Amino acid sequence: VGSEMCIRDRYNFAKEAGCNKIALGHHYDDVIETILMGMLYGSQIQTMMPKLHSTNFEGMQLIRPMYLIREADIKHWRDYNDLHFIQCACKFTDTCTTCNPDGVTKSKRMETKQLIAKMKEINPYVESNIFKSVENVNLRTIIAYKEDGVKHHFLEHYDEWK
């Protein structure tokens, strides 16, 4: 309920201010974590789009201006400028109230972040490869895909794709 209220308040504030866009703070690391989480925990291939129309608030768009900025760069900029981020639902702050007392969160996102760090030890390109994987989708090599909520199977196009 808390985060839903926050979202509604954000939209209402934007609407009252005459805005048609809301800028969100998601960054590059959020994007690659979301891609991998979708595969590992959601049985799907999808990404976090840099710009999209709101499905719940007519005429409102969501934009992610920090989509290509690394989390470490944002934190470096924050520290360089002696800034402190407010506590938020996405747990961007280093000290969050939803973390365990030992500072380790049990979230799937944190597990995914740690998994990516481990994979990076083996392959230094793993982060960019995850990001590019959703740009380089070849539908002819996918068993099935969804478009506008309708599932399509490769056999629908099998004879066309000779």
Question: Where are the regions that the model predicts?
Answer:
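Catalytic subdomain that performs nucleotidyl-dependent activation
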Residues: D29-E111, L115
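Aromatic/hydrophobic pocket-lining residues that form π-stacking "cages" and hydrophobic walls in ligand
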Residues: D9-R10, I74
